[in-house]
Amino acid sequence: METLQARFDAVQEQLLEIYEQDTSSLDVQITYWTLIRHEQALYYYARRQGILRLGIYQVPPTGVSEKKAKDAIKMTLFLKSLQKSEFAAQPWSLPETSLERFLAAPENTFKKRGQHVTVIYDKDSMNAMEYTLWTEIYAVDDNDQWHKYTSGVDYDGIYFTDAQGNKNYYVSFADDAALYSKLGHWEVQYENQVLSPPVTSSLPPGPNRRRGPQTRGHPRHKSASFRRSASSGSDTRDSRGRSRSPSSSRSRSRSRSRSPSGSHSRPRAPHVPDQETGRPPGGGGRRGSRDQQQGPGGPAPPSPGEVGTRSGPPETKAKGRLAELISAAYDPPVLLLQGCANTLKSFRRRTTQSYPHTFLCMSTSWTWASKTCTVKSGHRMLVAFVNSEQRTLFLATVKIPKGVTCLKGSFDGL
């Protein structure tokens, strides 16, 4: 029993060192999964001997240990194969080589640089889903050769393009529309663009009306003021993508404006482009300036240097989901955990491995060092979040260990 406990403690100590180092070496990731296999083997042996606890850790059933040991062997084999490829010198972190990400769609591939894609069903902002687009995907073929693919998104789903130029969809919006949509309609939002189904016009093209190119993607904040700022000699384009000659519209306007005596009224002065008047497109100077700073969607998001600069609490009267997120970005919320050092370290390891999406960053365990401090002794750990919604998700998803207290707070910056 003592020998088993000593070997188990040695494995745990090596795992904690890897967590503390937070290195991006592929060799360290291979060592990590080798230690996980040793850990599960010790769990399996202890359970077979009737031992239910090893230190502060509860021994899982043999079926669980066997399954996790096989997963560790699988990850070790894939990582050793990746180590022989041209991508071995790239940085590889623990989240990027985790089992959860490796099994996420597309399965059995390593993924980096995930980005959010929002899909709104039936034009209802409350009926929206978020998907992850992996910018970099690393996959191995039947010849044990590794390839790097890039991902893209269109109205049909999220895909990666293989070496032959074929699109391989790993997320299909139509499949989820059968579950979440009643009308079979959805809208894709990605990187300031809205991807919608093409709209065809019922008006036939004429000599003064021609169709504009149809695109599935268009800028999210495209304003009608850009159409009004066209010069007098160019075509104006309506909201459906059709272009219309200004001369024809003016001729119709002049033909309808007659004086009571039957003579034509004098034509109005030609339209002067906004660029020549010095005004911003779309109206007066003050209003146009405000629209350029904030954009049609609401307040402008903070720059990287402004994140965490507010000295007071976030505003609670922000209108709309985007405004709330922008308001909360200035004051990153945190949790202060207090408890035993080993318990906090184990909690950080388990949370980092199983729930990396529920928090922004997590500190090491620490204590107050000043002799004048009257606060009770004990180790502490800080958990930072992107916003209060993520902190709520963390508290609802992650189980706080017994004996660990939790306090809410916020910082001016991280």
Curated annotation (Swiss-Prot):
Primary role: Plays a role in the initiation of viral DNA replication. A dimer of E2 interacts with a dimer of E1 in order to improve specificity of E1 DNA binding activity. Once the complex recognizes and binds DNA at specific sites, the E2 dimer is removed from DNA. E2 also regulates viral transcription through binding to the E2RE response element (5'-ACCNNNNNNGGT-3') present in multiple copies in the regulatory regions of the viral genome. Activates or represses transcription depending on E2RE's position with regards to proximal promoter elements including the TATA-box.
Keyword DNA-binding: yes
Localization per Swiss-Prot or TrEMBL: Host nucleus
Gene symbol of the encoding locus: E2
Organism: Bovine papillomavirus type 3
Region (DNA-binding domain): 331-414
Region annotation Transactivation domain: where it falls in the sequence: 1-202
UniProt keywords, alphabetically: Activator, DNA replication, DNA-binding, Early protein, Host nucleus, Phosphoprotein, Repressor, Transcription, Transcription regulation
Annotated protein name in UniProt: Regulatory protein E2
GO molecular function: DNA binding; DNA-binding transcription factor activity; nucleotide binding
Modification(s) after translation: Phosphorylated.
Region feature (Disordered): 196-317
Main location as per UniProt: host cell
